[in-house]
């Protein structure tokens, strides 16, 4: 009899856990039908944001509230017919709240959107297989993109920026961390900049890139697989490298105040 009671209790506990998970999954869930070049804006405060391209025809957003004080944070939706606009809002009655929101966004693969901005104050931002005007930023966390195309701008105050298999133009910066960017195809003639105040910068460009290139580091080494001339700075400590690749149709700047700078072929 006791064994049967324990079994029933176990089943009840399992069902309760399942219902709790279902409830968590329903913190926020909505689908939006916007057109190409419309805006997707996610403003988070604490928590990660993930954006993924998929084989669908609508923008889908799911948000999970996490933490002991999760009831004191909510998702504010001010979206319009041509704009997905979501923001994390915290109760003014509660300070030092142990609560965060994790956003998971899916967008139709191959459709260009204006991701401006996608941001979080404390958390990581990750994206794959997305296209458009991409503006990602976090104050404390990493920014990671893979297979993105368009105009990409990724920044963090404290964390790493890693961009793989990008197509288009890229600007990336961090105050404390490393910048790694791989660009497999350059489109247009947009200028590009890669910088780290305290960290390393490593960029890969197509071997046939057209660019007016400048590399610099105040405390570190320079390395390049392109025909650039590396020289010591005449007036300050550090090293510089300059050169024109092809027609020099765009400016490309790589810099670090304290770290190594490398420009390689993708």
Residue map of PLM features:
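Intrinsically disordered, low-complexity terminal regions
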Residues: 1-266
